[in-house]
C-alpha cells in the first residue's frame, strides 16, 4: 500500500538477457515478478525489469527518482533513496538505508552494503561494504577520491 507510480514508468517488463545459439541471440526467459513493498515512490520514466529466475524487489520506504533503470533480479533494501538516471545492472543487491546520487551506475552481481552513500556520476564495479561513502570511477572511498582529485 501507499506505492506511488509516476507517469511513464514501466514495471515488470522482460529483462535484457540473451544467449547465443547457432549465430542467433535467443532471449533468456524471465519468469520472476517485481515486488514493491509499502510506502515507495517510483519516478517518471523509471523502468524496473522482472526477475529472470528470482524476483526483483524494491524494499519498504524506498524512493526512486525519474529515469532510473533497475534490471532483473535486483534487490533493493528498505529506506533507500536513488536519484535520477541511475542504472543498476542485473542481480545486484542493494542494502538498507542506501543513498545513490544521480547518474551513478552499478555493475551486475554486486553487493552494496547497508548505510552506503554513492556519489553522483560514480561507476561501481566492486562490492561496497557497510557504512561506506564512495565516489568516482571506479568508485573509491570518498576520502581517497577527494585526496586524489
What are these language model-derived features?
Residues 2-4:
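Short, small-residue-biased leader/transition segments that mark boundaries at the very start
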Residues 10, 16, 45-47:
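Active-site beta-loop-alpha junctions enriched in small/polar residues
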Residues 10, 123-124:
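Conserved sequence/active-site signature of Rossmann-fold short-chain dehydrogenase/reductase
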Residues 12-24:
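Acidic/polar low-complexity surface segments
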Amino acid at each position: 500500500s501507499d506505492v506511488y507510480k509516476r507517469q511513464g514508468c514501466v514495471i515488470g517488463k522482460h529483462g535484457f538477457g540473451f544467449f547465443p545459439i547457432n549465430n542467433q541471440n535467443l532471449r533468456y526467459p524471465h519468469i520472476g515478478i517485481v515486488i514493491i513493498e509499502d510506502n515507495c515512490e517510483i519516478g517518471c520514466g523509471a523502468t524496473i525489469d522482472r526477475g529472470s529466475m528470482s524476483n526483483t524487489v524494491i524494499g519498504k520506504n524506498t524512493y526512486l527518482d525519474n529515469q532510473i533503470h533497475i534490471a532483473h533480479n535486483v534487490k533493493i533494501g528498505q529506506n533507500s533513496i536513488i536519484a535520477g538516471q541511475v542504472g543498476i545492472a542485473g542481480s545486484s543487491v542493494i542494502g538498507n538505508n542506501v543513498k545513490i546520487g544521480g547518474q551513478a551506475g552499478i555493475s551486475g552481481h554486486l553487493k552494496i552494503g547497508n548505510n552506503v552513500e554513492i556519489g553522483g556520476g560514480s561507476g561501481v564495479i566492486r562490492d561496497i561494504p557497510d557504512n561506506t561513502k564512495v565516489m568516482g570511477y571506479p568508485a573509491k572511498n570518498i576520502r581517497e577520491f577527494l585526496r586524489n582529485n
